[in-house]
Amino acid sequence: MSRWFPSVQAIRSTKLETFVQVGLAATLVLNVWVNPAVAADPFRTKEARNIGDKTEAAFKAIFQQGDYKAAEAYLQQALVSEPNEPLAYAMKASLAYTNKDWTTLDTYSKKTLEMGQKLIASDPLRGNIYTAVGHFLEGAALVRRQGTVNGATQALSKLQEVYKYLDKAEAISPNDPELNLLKGYMDLMLAVNLPFANPQQAIERLDKNAGPEYLADRGIAYGYR
């Protein structure tokens, strides 16, 4: 994994800030509600997971209707009726980042990590995926609290944890569309924002195994820009 992590001195502060911002945007993009016919799972046509009605409604409010106020209301309900769904907490954290609400970002990044870790026992694939997402969001919160330069070392440590858990998920189901979409996007964000990195491997991952197809294609297009 060391090939993903150049020295802190090699990272330009503006690049790291860009990575955090684009990566959080990617976290939102990857959770788009795509196909209502697929058991609340926009990624899989086999072994689909249910994420809960309120979380689903929040997806629709954000990505179909652009109604963030309604989405916040649905997410508040989801935290009560679907308290073990880490995606609800991840969306709360991502919306907090969008709203520059750093206290809420800090709170829900920690909850995303906690719920992801809890999910590992019953769904190791998604549990490891969202444990990785939780570490990513915590890294973003660190950068916001401490600044890009002061928070760089800890943020990179978090990034190592992100890939540790994504690798665990990949060991369980290497061709899983949700995993490959998320990991493909994160690899891509690193490749285009850090020096000496090549986006080709990320592009190939998105092309071969990620789903849904149109989001994979969006990532591929970004990689070729």
Placement of each model-derived feature along the sequence:
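Short coil/linker segments at helix-helix boundaries
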Residues: 41-44, 50-53, 62-69, 92-168, ...
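N-terminal leader/linker segments that initiate helical-solenoid repeat arrays
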Residues: 2-4, 21-24, 28-98, 106
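TPR alpha-solenoid repeat register
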Residues: 88, 127, 179, 212-216, ...
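N-terminal secretory signal peptides that target proteins for export/translocation
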Residues: 1-16
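Aromatic-lined carbohydrate-recognition surfaces of secreted/lumenal glycan-active proteins
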Residues: 182
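Intrinsically disordered, low-complexity coil segments
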Residues: 11-13, 117-121, 215-216
